[in-house]
């Protein structure tokens, strides 16, 4: 395997290559390549978001994160349909994330709930057809980040401009990398495959309904950072209930561990470099292949921002409460939803 090809591997691929090394020299080489890949990835991400913030305003740095996430994911991920139609869908998703997230945030919680359901239905039904691709971790996460860090006035106009540029860049990268792939399916085939008896459709509906409901309840309870609960719910909703229960446990444990680690760093490090704790978290995620460790390090970035607004005690309390509420509610919702759908199918048979 050539150097460039090895750089294209994900964390699991790189770690597997290291494990399969036959000599110490070979193992050290693969470790060096892996560390170099992490370093250039972190540097690229930092420079990209910094440049985006300079061009479109610091309040839109989160939009830069969303654009960066889409570019990095969709250079490899796809929608399993015709490349041309997929590219059009990708542009539609950017419009959806930019417009609907802003509209939903401006409305009262219940009205915003309806907008969020419609917006997520477009993203999930058309963009998350294959659960194993985990496209929801990009599209739904991106939507929720823009929703949670909404802006208005001139800043929103700059966000529109930034997301438009991001859409063009992502579509170019996506089409360039996928234009030679052949898929027999088109958009109409995806819509025709809607079936309440299928595991995939039930999973999609849980994502579409549960995540907005979680956010709505959090907002009605006047919880700041309601989108944290939505992100937590999104991340644990999986097609198979056993997998979902596993993720719920790991999310709660990982979040508490992340809060403890962040608190320790907060007291050990000097205040001028608190913001870099989020960078440490990003590096940690880069090294992580297991969901539990990703949950730990993802906590760093969220708390690095929240502590500036709510203080350490407030941010930590919010993080734990929102995440536990989000994942537990999602688990209960999915159990009830699956039971309800099974009852409907039984009545149809009778």
Give residue ranges: language-model regions:
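Hydrophobic alpha-helical transmembrane segments
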Residues: 39, 86-91, 113-117, 156-164, ...
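Membrane-interface helix-loop-helix junctions at boundaries between adjacent transmembrane segments
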Residues: 101-192, 196
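N-terminal signal-anchor module of multipass membrane proteins
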Residues: 1-90
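Membrane-helix interface and helix-disruption motif detector
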Residues: 51-59, 84, 97-111, 153-162, ...
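Intrinsically disordered, low-complexity non-transmembrane regions of multi-pass membrane transporters
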Residues: 1-35, 178-201, 342-350
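Transmembrane alpha-helical segments of multi-pass membrane transport proteins and ion-pumping complexes
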Residues: 42-50, 54, 89-102, 116-125, ...
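Pore- and pathway-forming membrane helices of multi-pass small-molecule/ion transporters and channels
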Residues: 42-46, 59-77, 113-152, 167, ...
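Transmembrane helical segments that form the transport core of multi-pass membrane transport proteins
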Residues: 212-265, 269
